From Swiss-Prot:
GO biological process, one term: N-acetylmuramic acid catabolic process
Transmembrane segments: none
Organism in which the protein naturally occurs: Francisella tularensis subsp. tularensis (strain SCHU S4 / Schu 4)
Pathway(s) per entry: Amino-sugar metabolism; 1,6-anhydro-N-acetylmuramate degradation; Amino-sugar metabolism; N-acetylmuramate degradation; Cell wall biogenesis; peptidoglycan recycling
Subunit structure: Homodimer.
UniProt protein name: N-acetylmuramic acid 6-phosphate etherase
Record function comment: Specifically catalyzes the cleavage of the D-lactyl ether substituent of MurNAc 6-phosphate, producing GlcNAc 6-phosphate and D-lactate. Together with AnmK, is also required for the utilization of anhydro-N-acetylmuramic acid (anhMurNAc) either imported from the medium or derived from its own cell wall murein, and thus plays a role in cell wall recycling.
Amino acid sequence: MNILENINTEKRNPRSLNLDSMSIAEAVSLMIDEEYGVIEALKEQHRNITEVILATSYSLRNGGRIIYIGAGTSGRLGILDAVECPPTFSVDYNTIVGLIAGGEKAFIQAQEGAEDDANFGKEDLQSINLTAKDIVIGIAASGRTPYVIGALEYANSIGATTVAISCTKQAKISKYAKYSIEAVPGPEVLTGSTRLKAGTTQKLILNMISTLSMVSVGKVYQNLMVDVKPTNQKLIERSKNIVCEATGVDYTTAEKFYLKANKSVKVAIVMILNNCDYEKALAILKNNNNFIKS
């Protein structure tokens, strides 16, 4: 039995049948054109993506975590999204977690066979002490990865919310999740190479999940990352510029309040907008559930 026969990500793309004989310029044009399928796939899944983000936001507001879990490219994309959240939003590294079949070493070197054992998915979730407050997002372009299915089964068994993200219709993993996103960008230019359009599609979905979930818990004011962690010179300068943009003050004033606020962009903004001291700004934020109210 051919288990991959009817999976969208394994089909041949008729537009790239002659990829090996195309000029580089022709192949570049083809690959650019093929990316339009990604946006159409996302538009088609608008409602499902929205439902997932409402669920992740609910989990975060109630003390839960977002857990991405996948194998290969899908697992790496989850890790990429997760590790960017602490510096961008000043959340704990355990707030959004990325897990990959084969462990951390699989991020830079493929661990053959790791994705084929459903029990590994369960064990990886147990290792981070998964709770019913958490939301587990299983990612698999093919929609059938045993590692992901095992993780979703375990998450369901303890009452955690579950999500399946795939790039094929009627994906097997969707049957194991409360919410599912089946975004199908079409066959790859290089047959079966899901690091291409499927990977791009998944990355854009994860971008939306993490960014808009953070918006929902007060990590953004207007469109500014007011909880940015100033860990290098670029981010220190960005922090001061954010204070300028949010309040309309000049750079010198922004820098003064930034330092008075112990280098917290959010607190500096509240101090300026409310003409108050540091302690009062903290109290205002606490009263507003850490949202800036202008």
